[in-house]
């Protein structure tokens, strides 16, 4: 059977998203479309950034990590499944960003500003907004007590219809929903060509092979832990089910990707 490259291997797949937006001009365009008021003109981009999270004793891989000349940190993550605890997931990524937001010897008031941005192909909160942004209140009963934590938790809804967004962001959200269309902008056509080039490359095959190995290792570990705890089936979900959400994110995200990508080979 001939593979339909446009069906499963879309821009919402983590490695594909990270690769396409590893190019500074693509990353800059995306950030400008999401945060036009910041006037971002340049930045250092690190796709699929690996950070060692000592608390969990494992490496954590970020989809798209960027820092501008003012020291602001931007972490953009594709979220393709509904989450039981989105707030915990934001907190988890925030804890990782905080590792880079204050250098040793700096005062607390020098802590960098961070933007954790989740992009969803569905409406995560069901209110129809294009963009949801969280706020921290020092007094839950007083909406005027918003704390300036220098953190921004932003959820972008590809299915949104309420609120104002840039035309560039709307183009990108339409691309997530519909793929390439006759109305797609030149930028969307460009990143779609880069997506196709990537999934036809040896680099993509190597990346997918690494994910397949990761899945195999996770299944083996799950079976081992499942036997130890007397579970009937030692599948990956069985292993992860009894742990905190913060301990799920790093590997489970990619395990899920491999499963979806494997379907595209059928």
What are these regions (language model features)?
Residues 156:
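Conserved phosphate-donor/acceptor-positioning beta-strand/loop module used by diverse small-molecule
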Residues 1-7, 15, 74-79, 166-266:
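Short, charged alpha-helical interaction segments and adjacent helix-coil junctions
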Residues 1-152, 162:
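Accessory alpha/beta interaction modules
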Residues 159:
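His/Asp/Glu-rich acidic catalytic environments and adjacent acidic regulatory segments
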């Amino acid at each position: 059977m001939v593979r339909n490259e446009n069906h499963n291997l879309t821009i919402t797949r983590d490695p594909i998203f990270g690769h396409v937006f590893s190019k500074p001009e693509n990353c800059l365009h995306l950030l400008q479309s999401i945060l036009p008021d910041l006037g971002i003109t340049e930045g250092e981009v690190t796709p699929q950034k690996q950070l060692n999270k000592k608390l969990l004793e494992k490496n954590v891989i970020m989809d798209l990590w960027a820092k501008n000349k003012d020291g602001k940190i931007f972490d953009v993550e594709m979220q393709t499944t509904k989450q039981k605890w989105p707030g915990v997931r934001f907190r988890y990524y925030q804890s990782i960003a905080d590792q880079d937001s204050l250098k040793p010897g700096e005062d607390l008031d020098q802590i960098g500003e961070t933007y954790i941005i989740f992009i969803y192909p569905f409406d995560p909160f069901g209110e129809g907004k294009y963009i949801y942004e969280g706020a921290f209140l020092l007094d839950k009963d007083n909406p005027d007590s918003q704390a300036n934590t220098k953190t921004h938790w932003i959820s972008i809804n590809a299915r949104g219809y309420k609120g104002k967004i840039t035309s560039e962001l709307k183009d990108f959200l339409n691309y997530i929903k519909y793929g390439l269309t006759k109305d797609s902008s030149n930028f969307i056509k460009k990143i779609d060509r880069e997506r196709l080039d990537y999934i036809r490359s040896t680099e993509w095959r190597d990346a997918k092979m690494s994910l397949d190995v990761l899945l195999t290792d996770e299944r083996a570990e799950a079976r081992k832990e499942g036997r130890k705890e007397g579970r009937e089936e030692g599948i990956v979900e069985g292993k992860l089910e009894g742990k905190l959400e913060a301990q799920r994110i790093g590997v489970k995200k990619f395990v899920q990707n491999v499963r979806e990508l494997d379907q595209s080979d059928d």
